[in-house]
Amino acid sequence: MYTDWLIDKLRCPGNLTSLKLIGHSFESDGKLYNVKNDILSIVYPDDIDGDDAKYNRFYNLFAPLYDLNERVMGKLLTGVDMIKGRKQIISLLGLNPDMRILEVSPGPGVFQKGLRTEIGENGEFVALDLSMGMLRQCQKRNGSLNVQLIHGNALFLPFADDSFDALFHFGGVNLFNDPQKAISEFIRVVRKDGIVSWGDEGFSENYRDERRKKILLKINPGFGKPHPLIPDSVCNIKEYDVYEGLGYLIVARKK
């Protein structure tokens, strides 16, 4: 199910108290969080609202169609080779073999093969998503990669402080109810001097295709959203343009 290391790091997302393993469930203060089909569901709060609820419903429905949509529409709409773009992003993270990493909001797992290659077969790999539909797509795509999947909320990560060597997130910051809180959580669960990285769609200053820009903004207003502020709790900050100027990536170290 889950490694002993991860079980030790799991926490109640509401108050960060330790969890007790009982059969195929985890318990905290009388509340049970169940594991079904090898995925622990530990979402907090119970009544997700706002954009988080709206996009969760959408992604649960959209999950089975993600790959088809990317193949048919991705290149046509953006003009970008997504596979090449993902390889570039992974190469910028600075991952090393045997690292313990958390991927937040993996979607259908399109980065996971590359991430597993970077940390090797002995690295601990955990992925958390609010969409159960997307987690099931991760299982179908990457069942052999030994990724430990968690159904949870990026704004209330169910892990102890300083648990991971690295955290990676791409593609959901613009959709969170509170992007700044999510980034604070990213930093909290990474050890001192660990890698914290996040990014999303957004036009670079040098992007000049005005016609395509108008089309993309109409389809996805997230392209026009300002980037979240970078907290003072990270250092060695590097900012990259990715996906040929249609996205950004922040890679930093926790102070």
Language-model features and meaning:
Residues 218-234:
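Short alpha-helix
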Residues 8, 37, 43-94, 110, 195-220, ...:
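Conserved class I S-adenosyl-L-methionine
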Residues 155-166:
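A short acidic, Gly/Pro-enriched loop at the edge of an enzyme's catalytic core
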